[in-house]
Design a protein with these regions (language model features):
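Selective recognition of specific alpha-helical transmembrane segments in multi-pass small-molecule
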Residues: 108-116, 192-206, 217-237, 270, ...
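Helix-loop-helix module between adjacent transmembrane segments
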Residues: 31-32, 105-129, 136, 140-173, ...
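Membrane-interface loop-to-helix entry segments
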Residues: 23-30, 34-47, 155, 172-179, ...
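Extracellular/periplasmic helix-exit of transmembrane alpha-helices
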Residues: 114-123, 128, 229-245, 253, ...
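N-terminal alpha-helical transmembrane segments of multi-pass membrane transport
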Residues: 1-77, 81, 92-97, 109, ...
Length: 444
């Protein structure tokens, strides 16, 4: 087991500290310039579609979801425990300046996720009365023959293991730990309850999943945003200092408290880009499964909507988490991850902070379980056919129960590894799709 742990750590170090940072950020930069910075040009249209066009909430066809349902299903997966723990880890390891580099990665990532959604729409198929799409479809579209089949199969195996099984174990563990800490409820009992409710949603397929996410995701986001804003109002003088530390720390971390912790510009950049990309999932190949299901007139319309998911995830929710941590003065107390975030909310809400974090963890992690289950399901159908879906659902439910009680350090590291491995075929395909995306964008 020690050998396995070391191998996983070495692979993750190579992938997440070096290779994927360059590839993911590079793909975002290439698409940004190629599409003439579509994340800026179409940002207003995206916001208008998200908040002003009520037809997004309706317009459900027989074969797909509304654009809003597809977006909330994607956000359900994007906004997870990483939005609480991820920002805290980045700040603790890379200093306040890491948040600036999170913004940079998200900015370029918006162009990448636009391309993913456009290609998912362009190459989707009608199967069993529902639209289905994702990286496996556009991988085989752009690469014919054995190479395309190999890349698609490799991606499917990686995402099933990374998200469907191991990733969902980690999410249920976060819920169990949070509720045990706040309410002293046994972790196993929490895991069983989560698994039962999740199983009921799984049985209903994509329609029930979408119906669930379109109701829960706005509530969950609003609850967390209000909680963060309340704390920021209570610590208003610290907000200005927080923004100053973010910008100074991005280029001169030694000039602030982070310098005493040995934080460098390279370290701030590495942790900011890594945690940002991992949280918003731009370029990772997960969210295209959701965006492929939307019934829209033009694939590029859903691409614009997809960009809003990255904006909400990183520029709103992750940023608010970071500001709460920095403005409450808990940075430097020796904690990291969710513990650091929890300390910040305890400063703002007292003992209610534990309860607030537990509720947020429940919403964030549970919706991620639902979203990740569906992404895995699409790939199970691709590899093994419809008959394997029930077996897959049972395994996921078991993983949710087991994950609630385990120490999941190795499981999380393995999920990171397979998550990284699934990015590689997706990025190869996206770079191969550059001319297609550019052509579709010009026509729209």
């Amino acid at each position: 087991m020690e050998f396995v742990t070391k191998v996983v750590e070495c692979v993750n170090t190579f992938l997440w500290d070096y290779a994927l940072l360059v590839l993911l950020l590079g793909a975002g930069i290439i698409y940004s310039f190629s599409l003439k910075f579509i994340q800026i040009r179409k940002f207003g249209a995206g916001m208008k579609a998200l908040f002003g066009n009520f037809s997004l909430h309706g317009g459900k066809g027989e074969n797909g979801l509304s654009s809003f349902q597809a977006l909330t299903t994607a956000i359900a997966a994007q906004v997870g425990t990483g939005n609480i723990a991820g920002a805290a880890t980045a700040i603790a390891s890379g200093g306040p300046g890491s948040i600036f580099w999170m913004w940079v990665s998200a900015f370029f990532g918006m162009a990448t996720i636009y391309a993913e959604a456009v290609m998912a729409q362009h190459t989707r198929k009608l199967e069993n009365g529902h639209y289905v799409g994702g990286p496996v479809y556009y991988i085989k579209y752009v690469f014919k023959g054995r190479f395309g089949k190999f890349l698609a199969g490799f991606f499917s195996v990686a995402i099933i293991l990374a998200l469907g099984f191991m990733g969902n174990m980690v999410q249920s563990n976060s819920i169990g730990a949070a509720f045990n800490n706040a309410f002293h409820v046994p972790k196993l009992a929490v895991g069983i309850c989560v698994a039962v409710i999740a199983g009921i949603i799984f049985i209903g397929g994509i329609k029930r999943i979408a119906s669930f996410t379109e109701k829960i995701v706005p509530i969950m986001a609003l609850l967390y945003i209000i909680g963060c804003l309340v704390i920021l109002v209570m610590h208003l003088p610290g907000v200005g200092t927080a923004f100053k530390d973010i910008f100074v720390g991005a280029f001169a971390p030694q000039a602030i408290a982070g310098g005493a912790l040995g934080v460098t510009v390279q370290k701030a950049m590495r942790f900011g880009v890594a945690r940002g990309l991992f949280s918003n999932e731009a370029g990772m190949g997960s969210t295209p499964h959701a965006h492929a299901t939307a019934e829209v007139k033009d694939p590029c319309d859903q691409g614009i909507i997809a960009m809003m998911g990255v904006f909400i995830d990183t520029f709103i929710i992750l940023t608010l988490t970071a500001l709460v941590i920095l403005s409450t003065g808990v940075l430097g107390n020796g904690q990291t991850g969710s513990e650091l975030a929890q300390s910040a909310f305890n400063v703002g809400f007292g003992n209610f902070g534990n309860i607030f974090i537990a509720l947020c963890m429940l919403f964030f992690a549970f919706t991620t379980i639902v979203g990740w289950y569906y992404f895995g399901e699409v790939n199970v159908r691709h590899l093994f056919g419809n008959g394997a879906v029930k077996v897959y659902a049972v395994i996921v439910v078991i993983c949710v129960i087991i994950g609630s009680t385990l120490k999941v350090d190795l499981v999380w590291d393995m999920a990171d590894m397979f998550n990284g491995l699934m990015v590689l075929p997706n990025l190869i395909a996206l770079l191969g799709c550059l001319a297609i995306v550019r052509k579709l964008t010009k026509k729209s």
